[in-house]
Structures are given as C-alpha cells and as structure tokens.
From Swiss-Prot:
Topology with respect to the bilayer: Multi-pass membrane protein
Primary localization class, coarse: membrane
Originating organism: Thermotoga petrophila (strain ATCC BAA-488 / DSM 13995 / JCM 10881 / RKU-1)
Pathway(s) annotated for this protein in UniProt: Lipid metabolism; phospholipid metabolism
Name of the protein: Glycerol-3-phosphate acyltransferase
Amino acid sequence: MGWWLFPILGYFIGSIPFSYLIPKWLKGIDVRKVGSGNVGATNAIRTTGPVVGGICLLLDALKGFFPVFIATTFSGDPKLVSLTAIATVLGHDFPIFMKFKGGKGVASTLGIIFCLSWPTGIVFTLTWLVIVMLTKYASLGSLVALYISALLGYLFKGYDTGMLILILAVLSTLRHSENIQRLLNGTERKVNLFKR
C-alpha cells in the first residue's frame, strides 16, 4: 500500500459531513442555516439538542480515530501517522463534499487523540465538559482542552504525539479566530449541553 494512500484516505473520511447529514436526516435541519452556521458538532448540539448533536460528535470523532488507527496499524511511521491525522482534520475543516466549508476540527481531533493516547483523550473530554458546563462556551472549552492535550500527549507518549496534537490545536485555533474575538468582546454564543 502506497504511503500516500493513508493521508488521502484520511482526507476523504474527514470530509464526510456527519454534522450536516445527521441533523438533516433525523430532524430536517440544515445546520448551515441555523445557530452559528458551522458544520460541526457544537452547532449540531446547539441547534438539534444533545441526542442528535451527540451522535454527530461521536461520528466526527470516529472519522478522526479510524484513519489514524489504520495508518498506525499498517505503517507505524510517526511522520506518516501525523500526516494522515492532519489530512483527516483538514478534510473535516475543508470537506470536498461541502464545497470546502466544514467545521473546526475539534471532534475529529478528539478521535485522533483517543487513538494515540486514550488517557489524554479522557482528560480532554473531562476538561471540555467542566469548562462548558461552567461557562457555556464550547469554543473556550475546546481550545483549553486542546492545548492541555498537547502537553499531556508529550508527557504520556513523547515528542511526536505532543507535537502532532499541538499542530492540530493551532489549526483549530485558526478556525476559531472569530470565536476568540467574540469571547474577548463578550458576544460569544453559548451552548447548553443538556437541552436545546
């Protein structure tokens, strides 16, 4: 199997827009036209509720997990695994099936983190939950959890894993630029995890 097939597979799997498809199929809601308009799990949770949004979150995480799992299983080369992970998140962020307008990569990155270091994935999840429950700001929870995960990935698994998660954190930060501005202005949208 050619090395280049792994990142290509990752990109196309990452491009599957579960956070658009699931709300559309189950609730008839186009997430591009409601809430923040973002094709991601947070907007799905905000606009369709915790059940449908939770399904989107799980599927978006799994599409991050599996390409990296495949690359790790059949290659194991850290550089190829990293390239596959980055390609997968870029697929989520810029999906070919949605005219390159996608999400912000958090759920897919979470799946990648669980694949590389499940203890780090658990810490990410708990950090995100605590911050979002306290502040109602999913973007804040995501960014804090990502950078904590980069440090833990380095401590638990070494330089390659820590650096990969850091790169993915930076990519997500760039995708969250408008959210960061709204957080600073006090106008960021809030999300309630337990009700629509």
